[in-house]
Amino acid sequence: LGVFLDGYNKERVDCEKLIMTSSNYITASSNFEQNLISESYQIDKNKIKKITPGIDRSLFAPDLSANRKNIFLSIGRIQQQKGQRVTIDFLNNFRKVENDFVCYFIGGPSGNSGKEYLVELKEQVVELNLETHVKFLENLPQTKIKELLNESKLLIHTSQFETFGLVAIEANSMGVPVLSTNSGSFPEMIFSGVNGYLADNLV
């Protein structure tokens, strides 16, 4: 939704509101998004129908013979909304109890300040002496992401705002639990101790 984009775009928000108020029906990917649309744009909730996104299970199917390593993944566009800074802080704390791990950040910079944010993240890694534990891979094809999911033990997703975290469903489909914050749509799809872990704060 435009009202939550990095670098608030009034023109986009106005267009979204015009489209939504003029439409007979609106689709939302989660209960969270359904409520958000209704409250943010003053839309009758009865007009909003929830249709949960699916995934290609022929692609995101686990290799049961794969040898999983101490690899963590953070997959998503590099922008402040996605909360990668929190992930790095979490990794810095985690290192105090376990030093044998590496976390790959997959995704390119996005939004008005994405490139600047990526530079800040890399500086944060250096300041915390996490160079051997954190690697930035930027954009990768789905086939390569699947390979990494087969090798990984955890997906970390610390987005500040997520109407539907498709990457979490993809990871679960590959047998990878998800560590995330108790916000947005994640309480609808992640159940602590079952397919992942939720926390109010990770640091």
Regions found by a protein language model. Give the residues of each.
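Short hydrophobic beta-strand element within catalytic cores of glycosyltransferases
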Residues: A168, P177-S180
